[in-house]
């Protein structure tokens, strides 16, 4: 009975995968960092419920919009990446299409795939996924120093060199600069969306930890405490330097803006 059930599932699954599909991701909200691409039926524009969920049919169209980066994952490994807006055709023999390259060849390939699926309970032996990454600036991230942060005030003209304690509150922005690093080290395979709140606390904690050395860098530039609000760009650059090892080299994130609402 198990073989009969597997055979029935395999036939339905393989034939469902033969319809050419397209993958498209509409504009993502600012709180969405990663979204799994959904398979749409090429004929009706509806989600294809007949094919295997994690199979990309040969000849399928993949659309990449502005502010997005797309990666294709096959068996857990990244096999393609595209950050250029446009429509692309998926061209590989991993899952041959009945409607591409002649009915006979496609049917024969489907049959070979059908035989392989018996050992997987009617599910394709391949696991292919498309992920879309939001590469726009993620803005409006709030921060605030719970405890005062030391700030060194140096003025060589008058021989001043003292430490004061300051608090600051505001918002910052960041951007996914390397989606491959973000996928490998942060999000991995996700079923639907990977949202900002899942990493927000970690980023805020690291940002607040980096504030002290960043303040140290701008104080060395001779910037006074009262003028810090006029040098937020310099502070953002200093924060990027401090956070480059964790955010840049590990997370694939670049710090883009730092705003101070009160100091």
Q: What residue spans do the PLM features occupy?
A:
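N-terminal hydrophobic membrane-entry segments
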Residues: 1-263
